[in-house]
Amino acid sequence: MCGIVGIFNKSGDVSSEIYDGLIQVQHRGQDAAGISTWDGSKMHTHKELGLVTEAFKHDGARSHLVGNVGIGHVRYPTAGSDDVSEAQPFHTANPVNITLGH
């Protein structure tokens, strides 16, 4: 089963809280993790294969995830391949700017 964490904060960035939440909902069968945040004008996304700590281990992996609204996702594969293109949250700007995890 996948894990999803969403946070809205009136006055501050949410990426650290989403990261901490993803750590809590992950399990050993997980193959990918990602976070998307919204700063009021732009969507910021980072997603990689691996457990949460592996997906965000590179310096700066979370530094660009600014914004007071965000969603995080850990993927437990039941279909598809072991590829970063399967990692979520998914983002599209057509026809509307939206990011989602399921």
Predicted regions and their residues:
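N-terminal glutamine amidotransferase
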Residues: 1-102
